[in-house]
């Protein structure tokens, strides 16, 4: 096992422990608490994958952090903080919308890289909007916390979430997952659009209605479908 993978996990465990203490003292805001819950699931998944005990890893992580802080001067810390890019946390969903349980009549689940896509195939002929909570850096999506699909009535009918056992994903991973979710929902004659915030940061070349542009493969498939419909209509005439 790569020692850097182990030490990274150990430090992450200790830093999560510190953030948990902050939350216990009621010093964290909603985005802080949201990330804390998500990171807890991620650490459990990583610990299981690596075969490492979280409590033991936390103690070792504390030693690593203490050693670094002891060796680092205040001036070096100031320079690091000044040069580090700042990320922003953007929220389409409320805490209630993010934490609400939902159920599927005809569940479908697909794993796309480090992301899990879930949708209810029983939903038909609905107007659906995709909302997400995520962080942004350099005007691009940095980390997806959670994406959900809502009907006009507020029912949850789809979701994209990071896999706890596979931390880390790219902007391209998110775009691909959104395309899969949209395609699955539209298969049942639903009309899907994307929130303005997600449209702005997840991709730059969306159409005006919040839809990503069709890929060449999708365009060819649509052309074949149209030709097939035309032939059937001619035969019917």
Curated annotation (Swiss-Prot):
Residues 204-237 are annotated as: Disordered. Keywords: Eukaryotic host gene expression shutoff by virus, Host cytoplasm, Host gene expression shutoff by virus, Host mRNA suppression by virus, Host nucleus, Host-virus interaction, Inhibition of host innate immune response by virus, Inhibition of host interferon signaling pathway by virus, Inhibition of host PKR by virus, Inhibition of host pre-mRNA processing by virus, Inhibition of host RIG-I by virus, Inhibition of host RLR pathway by virus, Interferon antiviral system evasion, RNA-binding, Ubl conjugation, Viral immunoevasion. A motif (Nuclear localization signal) lies at residues 34-38. GO terms for cellular component: host cell cytoplasm; host cell nucleus. Gene3D superfamilies: Influenza virus non-structural protein, effector domain (3.30.420.330), S15/NS1, RNA-binding (1.10.287.10). A motif (Nuclear export signal) lies at residues 137-146. Upon interferon induction, ISGylated via host HERC5; this results in the impairment of NS1 interaction with RNA targets due to its inability to form homodimers and to interact with host EIF2AK2/PKR. InterPro entries: NS1, NS1A, NS1A_effect_dom-like_sf, uS15_NS1_RNA-bd_sf. Residues 180-215 are annotated as: CPSF4-binding. Residues 1-73 are annotated as: RNA-binding and homodimerization. The keyword RNA-binding applies. It is found in: Host nucleus; Host cytoplasm. GO terms for molecular function: protein serine/threonine kinase inhibitor activity; RNA binding. Residues 223-230 are annotated as: PABPN1-binding. It holds the Pfam family Flu_NS1. One of its GO terms (biological process) is symbiont-mediated suppression of host gene expression. Inhibits post-transcriptional processing of cellular pre-mRNA, by binding and inhibiting two cellular proteins that are required for the 3'-end processing of cellular pre-mRNAs: the 30 kDa cleavage and polyadenylation specificity factor/CPSF4 and the poly(A)-binding protein 2/PABPN1. In turn, unprocessed 3' end pre-mRNAs accumulate in the host nucleus and are no longer exported to the cytoplasm. Cellular protein synthesis is thereby shut off very early after virus infection. Homodimer. Interacts with host TRIM25 (via coiled coil); this interaction specifically inhibits TRIM25 multimerization and TRIM25-mediated RIGI CARD ubiquitination. Interacts with human EIF2AK2/PKR, CPSF4, IVNS1ABP and PABPN1. HAMAP family: INFV_NS1. Belongs to the influenza A viruses NS1 family. The dsRNA-binding region is required for suppression of RNA silencing. This is Non-structural protein 1. It comes from Influenza A virus (strain A/Fort Warren/1/1950 H1N1). The lineage of its organism: Viruses, Riboviria, Orthornavirae, Negarnaviricota, Polyploviricotina.
